[in-house]
């Protein structure tokens, strides 16, 4: 629909999303009854969708209140600095937060250029995707893994060498591509660059809405508490082995769940109330991007119920049992589906396999081989960059860039860039790590 009838799609996103959800729910209701349907729906909506969308919304609102001002000249060196800063920030404020925070300063810095699309493309590769691989705060797939028992700092401890290799390779490729396009700029463009670099006209780089950094810290604390509270005996019911709370159609709403949702919502509300309208308007803040994600993902999460059920039952017999296979299978599907449900599907498959390997990770859906978990995490996060629809921030960055006058590649044109620059990097990842 987005490719064929874009205008119709914009008006009917929620309708289409709910229609796909009903295509699963109605037959399931008749086959298994109301109770089983309610349990499956509650598990996905309460257990996955609500924490997922609340975290994304919290990061989006808080990061949208921070404005980076000042004169930045879009030279190769400065672009590399922004890409590196964004790649680091993405794991701590989310790929969505980092992308929304830095895309507009990057676009302003490069206004003097005619050729800007490649800068945005590498921004998507690094900031909107790869940089978010170190913590559950970084990218939604890892957050869903965290909700299923993957330790908060597991990815930080294990995936940083992969990230380091990818960042070094992609930055090197960016420098080569950027210098190529710099040579194509005309004299008038270079005169604009000279004006930007004149010391007497420069506005110092400054941060407005800096108090939102405190609200980001509150969000981080909320996510950490989700994993910490179940480990504290004082909050665990000795009879059930679960935290104190209530069950809604089998979905457990424990103290850790309430703490996380409450703190993120508190940070979001305080950010909205204490950030000036001017600061948000400088960032061109609007609700449309996060509303689109919320509408689409309600359908995605519901329709992944049967896939997860099949994989729980038959995941061990699919013939997928090597880290290399999981890396490419997870990545390939993450490119054309969203990477969040894809991650859950393959984590479920890995849990069904079971393992007694050293360092095995115990999750709520089974014990997972650490090398396979690394492959699933890397495949989902890194290959979410291969298409505009692979990860939530990709399309948001594209829309903002086009609004700023950048002529971005088409859907398939962007895939061409990814095939040329990302796939060779993934081949190196395969040779070194999987």
Task: Pin down the residues of each PLM region.
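Hydrophobic core segments of alpha-helical transmembrane domains in multi-pass membrane transport
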Residues: 1, 20-30, 56-64, 86, ...
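Transmembrane alpha-helix boundary signature
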Residues: 3-7, 25-48, 60-74, 88-101, ...
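Interfacial loop-to-helix junctions that mark the boundaries of transmembrane helices
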Residues: 8-15, 37-50, 152-162, 203-207, ...
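Membrane-interfacial helix-loop connectors
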Residues: 26-29, 90, 101-115, 119-121, ...
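Alpha-helical transmembrane segments
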Residues: 43-56, 154-173, 246-265, 328-335, ...
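Juxtamembrane and boundary regions of transmembrane helices in multi-pass small-molecule transporters
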Residues: 134, 153-201, 382-434
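Long, contiguous bundles of hydrophobic transmembrane helices that form the permeation core
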Residues: 170-238
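Transmembrane helical segments that form the transport core of multi-pass membrane transport proteins
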Residues: 216-353
